[in-house]
Amino acid sequence: MTHSSVNASSDPDLSHIGPRDKAEILAQALPYIRKFHGKTLVIKYGGNAMTDPALQADFAEDVVLLKLVGMNPVVVHGGGPQIETALNRLGKKGHFIQGMRVTDDETMEVVEWVLAGQVQQDIVGLINQAGGKAVGLTGRDGGMIRAKKLTMLDKDDASKEHDIGFVGEIVSIDPSVVKALQDDAFIPVISPIGFGENNESYNINADVVAGKLATVLKAEKLVLLTNIPGVLNKAGELLTDLTAREIDELFADGTISGGMLPKIEGALDAAKSGVNAVHIIDGRVPHAMLLEILTDKAYGTMIRSH
């Protein structure tokens, strides 16, 4: 492989950057701002960046800045920890099959309330406070995300199916409501909830929603904020620049496994479907998203379509 790698344990604290370095960063940003002016960026917001108040404020400022310099950010958010907290308060114990939460009627009500009523509105408020014009949506709004029940096959017996309730997979995405908001200078903030043919709600993996939405919007970039530095090789080094073909090789040799699989699969699908670049970024680093997109510095892994 020809990819670049760096030590993933390098100090991510940016507070030591002096005035001269800050000026250099601003100068580096100009060609990127020109290049991406008018382009759409879909951002999956999750992990520590959603729970640390300082990182929340940094994220909101970054999104507003991207909009102000002429880009079109679209935010898709998760909310697993917040859902877990709400269910615990209600005394409802989670039941999992092969790592997936079984989502019955009552759980789905909680999921919808937490994602669309709490988490989404917190994000909208932060972006607006930072000077942006954010609007909260779910996949129901404008008939955006049509979904169906996710079929889960038993990992040991493919002829056996597990019923995991109102966990959905995407049937289609109509991006017209998102495009209309972008045209009016708004920043869409989307909860990953779809609707079925009988108007039932489905909880959908936010990484999957972000990837599919980036594809249908013909986004320039998909940005995934995570709790890890990016894609690591077997020596624990950060791989900063990969092609879709190289990602396939990392799947094949077992370098990418476990909890990173669904995230990387979604990123790979987007890269293969026309999204020019996918960035997997350490959301624990203040302003890492801006630095990754607008400078020559690598603060995560970039997966290129070719």
Swiss-Prot record:
SUPFAM superfamilies: Carbamate kinase-like (SSF53633). Its EC number is 2.7.2.8. Keywords: Amino-acid biosynthesis, Arginine biosynthesis, ATP-binding, Cytoplasm, Kinase, Nucleotide-binding, Transferase. The record marks K44, K263 as: Transition state stabilizer. It catalyses: N-acetyl-L-glutamate + ATP = N-acetyl-L-glutamyl 5-phosphate + ADP. One of its GO terms (biological process) is L-arginine biosynthetic process. Pathway: Amino-acid biosynthesis; L-arginine biosynthesis; N(2)-acetyl-L-ornithine from L-glutamate: step 2/4. It is an enzyme of class 2 (transferase). It is found in: Cytoplasm. One of its GO terms (molecular function) is acetylglutamate kinase activity. Its main location: cytoplasm. GO terms for cellular component: cytoplasm. Pfam families: AA_kinase. Coiled coil: none annotated. Substrate binds at G79, G80, R101, N203. Catalyzes the ATP-dependent phosphorylation of N-acetyl-L-glutamate. Belongs to the acetylglutamate kinase family. ArgB subfamily. This is Acetylglutamate kinase. It comes from Polaromonas naphthalenivorans (strain CJ2).
